[in-house]
Amino acid sequence: MIKVNVLYFGAVREACDETPREEVEVQNGTDVGNLVDQLQQKYPRLRDHCQRVQMAVNQFIAPLSTVLGDGDEVAFIPQVAGG
């Protein structure tokens, strides 16, 4: 098992019970997509936002196939609207 730190911003934070960050324990070999699936089970309202976010691992935009390592920081980055 490894631990990753997950950060939530904006509407995603609201969907996650206003949790700004949390440490999540996952299996070795877990990728970002598996982590998102796990978090959607914990926070069902998160499903409504996952099509409109990008994921970052250690402050770099990362695909869902990115395998996580112990201590990684994973952030849900919501889209920004402009005008």
From Swiss-Prot:
SUPFAM superfamilies: MoaD/ThiS. One of its GO terms (biological process) is Mo-molybdopterin cofactor biosynthetic process. Disruption phenotype: Grows normally in liquid culture, traffics into host (human and mouse) acidified compartments early after phagocytosis, suggesting it no longer arrests phagosome maturation as well as wild-type, impaired growth in mouse macrophages. It holds the Pfam family ThiS. The keyword Nucleotide-binding applies. Pathway: Cofactor biosynthesis; molybdopterin biosynthesis. GO terms for cellular component: molybdopterin adenylyltransferase complex. InterPro entries: Beta-grasp_dom_sf (IPR012675), MOCS2A (IPR044672), Mopterin_synth/thiamin_S_b (IPR016155), ThiS/MoaD-like (IPR003749). Involved in sulfur transfer in the conversion of molybdopterin precursor Z to molybdopterin. Probably plays a role in host phagosome maturation arrest. This is Molybdopterin synthase sulfur carrier subunit. It comes from Mycobacterium tuberculosis (strain ATCC 25618 / H37Rv). The lineage of its organism: Bacteria, Bacillati, Actinomycetota, Actinomycetes, Mycobacteriales.
